[in-house]
Amino acid sequence: IPTQVTALGFIQLVADMKLEDNFIPLIIPAIAAPATFFYMKQYMESALPLSLVEAARIDGSGEFRTFNSIVLPLMKPAIAVQAIFTFVANWNNYFTPALVLHDDKMKTLPILIAQLCSADFLKFDMGQVYVTIAFSIFPVIIVYLFLSKYIVQGVAMGSVKG
C-alpha cells in the first residue's frame, strides 16, 4: 500500500501518541517494513535448506547456537541488501518526515534541499543546493561500501568451485 494512502491514519496515530517532532515514527516503520520481511523470508526459503537446521538439531545444537552459527551467516547477504535498500529509501524519504517533523532543527536533508530550492527563485544559491546534495550522498556511499563486502561474500559463498 502506498504511503500516501495510509498517511492520514498514520498522522492521527502519531498525534494520538504525541510523537510529533520525533524520529521514532520514522524509525519503527522502517525497521518493520512488510517488504523487508517478505524479501528476508523469500531469501531464507531459497538459501537455507531445512536439512541444515535439522542436522544441527540432531547434533545437539540449541536454537540460539543454530541461529548464530548457521542461519545468520547464510543470511548476511540478504541482511546487507535490505540494510542498504532501507537506508537509501529512508535517507531519501521526503513525504513522511515532512508530515511528522515540524521543528526546523528536526528537518531531514531532503526537506532542507526542497526548502532551499523553493526559496525565492531569483535569490536562492544553487551552489548551496549542490553542496547540500553532495553532502547528502556521502552517507549512502559509506553505507554501501561498508555493506558491499557481505554481498560479495554471499555471491562467493554460492559459487561452485571448479
For the regions a protein language model found, what residue spans apply to each?
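A structural signal for multi-pass alpha-helical bundles of membrane permease subunits
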Residues: I1-G162
